[in-house]
Amino acid sequence: MSYSAFVQARDFLQAHRTDYETAYRDYQPPQLTEFNWALDYFDVMAKGNDRPALWVVNEDGSEQKMSYSQMSQRSNQVANWLRGQGVKRGDRILMMLGNEVPLWDTMLAAIKLGAVLTPATTLLAPDDLRDRLDRGQVRHVIIGHTHTEKFTSLPGDYTRTTVGGAVAGWQQLEQAYQESTEFAPDGPTLATDPQLLYFTSGTTSKPKLVLHSQQSYPVGHLSTMYWLGLQPGDVHWNISSPGWAKHTWSCFFAPWNAGATIFIFNYSRFTAAAILETLVRCSVTTLCAPPTVWRMLIQEDLRKYPVKVRELIGAGEPLNPEVIDQVKEAWGITLRDGFGQTETTAQVGNSPGQPVKLGSMGRPMPGYQVRLVDMDGRVAEEGEICLDLASRPIGLMISYADDPEKTAEVMRDGFYHTGDTAAIDADGYITYVGRADDVFKASDYRISPFELESVLIEHEAVAEAAVVPSPDALRLAVPKAFLTLRAGYEPSRELARDIFVFLRSRLSPYKRVRRLEFGELPKTISGKIRRVELRKGEQDRGAAPRGALEFYEEDFEF
């Protein structure tokens, strides 16, 4: 029953993939009491299914291609072996693996067992891992064999398993592939049981623990499938590192919900040319990448690459209009934007076949009632992006684990509060303004950092930009831009003047960036700019002298 209900909802969205109005109006999420996505959907769909489910290509030319049927059987073997290692329903497993087949085996196996998976990036340092082990109440650790030293100073009552090599004191996951390919669950799984525990990237505070259920991500990501425009047989490439929610979004649930192939290209060092060549060589049909990657790709001559893609998507941070324009000019395909969080699936997006308004993230996705709420708690044309809890979306998290106060803070007054602000127009298109704590006032005018950053990266020398308030005796605060430059450009007084001139011709006087500084931008390990760090640095600097690469608009005559 759960399989047919899930597939019926999926098929409805795929049948209306270019008919947004019908999809949004008539979509009914499946109502499930018991549901285990890996057993009740994936295994049923995978039985006798020889279509490719996973295709991993390495930069040395080697590759692995696994069918749906193979992934079902391999994950059964891993589930049986993990059960033998003591993994029980509800146990928390920290998984820190690269883009390798055992990662997908382990994720499927954990779901089948009813365990709670805590994905972690391989970039984590021992102190970060200690935090995850302690706050995440981890009972089992599964990691790549090259990372075991990070755990030497992390004692604890957890089982230890490696992938890829033998290490003293650790079990090897490779032993699992001697187990039976048949798996029997120990009982039913409730749709409300916990499934995933994610640590957020911490752009503004200490990482929070986001707890998702057996339906919130698996079923909720039907909205993500719809936004991406995925169809059966697609070769879908999502450029994202394991350990982050976006990897689970688009390298696990969304493509497999659609019956598509997950494509992975493993490289030691990012180069735009290698990405574009792989895109062509492997006939990728749908590509999703963060704005940072898109900004690097457009520095190549995209017209030299005869891609076969149908859908292009940006995710992770808002897309700047300049990037969308350049991709459209080169390939004739509209790069589509969207919005979601670790706490949810895709909430807002420009869906396939719909008119795209430059600068807008699109419209609410099927299954989401999105409202903009102002400072007085009223629904408005500009305000915080909120979800109406009267029709609570399936894709919303259960809670912040072990933090009822924080959960109550974001789920108050009948809304889930995202902490992001936006504006909505008469057609229902939503335009991102910024994090609620990023928007600031200068001379009593509200300033959106994202708007100014979008203009800044239109300058030929600017690769990335972050705008924060800088204290000013007269205006209280003025916009200051921190800039990294494209290859071939060096910071200088002359370049600073040229950027100020460029901005004066494109921004109203009250919006102008009055100060700028060249240098590297602080980022989280997931690649998001830590504006909170830049903002705090400005607040704390006091009367400290300017840096050698810092310039004020007032230094120049125009």
Tell where the protein language model's regions lie, with residue ranges:
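Conserved AMP-binding/adenylation subdomain of ANL enzymes
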Residues: 218-238, 242-286, 300
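AMP-binding/adenylate-forming catalytic core of the ANL superfamily
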Residues: 124, 131, 141-144, 287, ...
